[in-house]
Amino acid sequence: MKCELCGGELDAVTLRCTGCGAKYTRVCVHCGAAMEAGEKACPRCGGEGLPGLDMTRQELTRAGIKCFMPYAGDRVYDIYFGGNHDGGGWEFHNERGYVREPPESRVVLPALVEGRPIYGIWNEFFCVGDEFVPGRQEEAYARMMQIRQIVVSNGVREAFTYSFFNCAGLETLELPRSMVSMKYDFYDLFMDGQEPMGNGVKKSPVTIRYRGTEEDWRKVAVTSRFWDYVAKGCIKMEYLGR
């Protein structure tokens, strides 16, 4: 497997990238559990383990990526990509989870933070609706148009309804075989067939590069609108195989 950050080879034993030194930890593609070094099958469910990008908190900060753990009462939930003014509970006031300025054209989302698996991508991770009020739209679109490619590492399991909200310049989205639910339906990008900023320019298709087979993808929960957009050519599927 190639490093998702630099394209270098991973050391077969340590799972460190031989190019940039990035750390990878084996993650079960079926249940999302982190696995010990040397384990090829998940001891919990028997699922296949694949290397997932494992960042430190400092590395996440440098990359402009926020994570948080929602909580309600005495229950603490999994780790998600995203931000929340309230920190948790049933009340959520989203704030941007990707805060790098200026944004990178290619954003890589890891699967773990210091060995702890990241479950999914929360709503409005890249931008929030408040950024598109009159007077702020031009600035928001200028930032979002810079993000052309998003790569999600092996182990992440879910993308929420507004996880890629208004990623206006998105051209390629690479998703792992561990994905079980893709709730984002691209409606905000293709509702009129034009680029979201209403400039009359036709929106180019988004290519989803899926690290699995077409049969695998058919098991992922998606919306009915998703397949409508595939049929219309707004979304192009590319199956990379196992």
What is each of the regions a protein language model found here?
Residues 62, 68, 74, 101-119, ...:
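Structural signature of tandem-repeat unit edges
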Residues 13, 24, 38:
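Short metal-coordination and nucleic-acid-contact micro-motifs, chiefly zinc-binding Cys/His arrays
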Residues 21-29, 45-53:
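Short Cys/His-rich micro-motifs in 6-15 aa windows
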Residues 7, 32:
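Detector for the canonical C2H2 zinc-finger "Cys2" submotif
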Residues 52-100:
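Short beta-strand/loop segment at the start of cytosolic alpha/beta domains
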Residues 124, 160-163, 185-188:
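Consensus positions within tandem repeat domains that build extended binding/scaffold surfaces
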Residues 2, 16, 27, 41:
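The −1 position to Zn-ligating cysteines in a subset of zinc-ribbon hairpins
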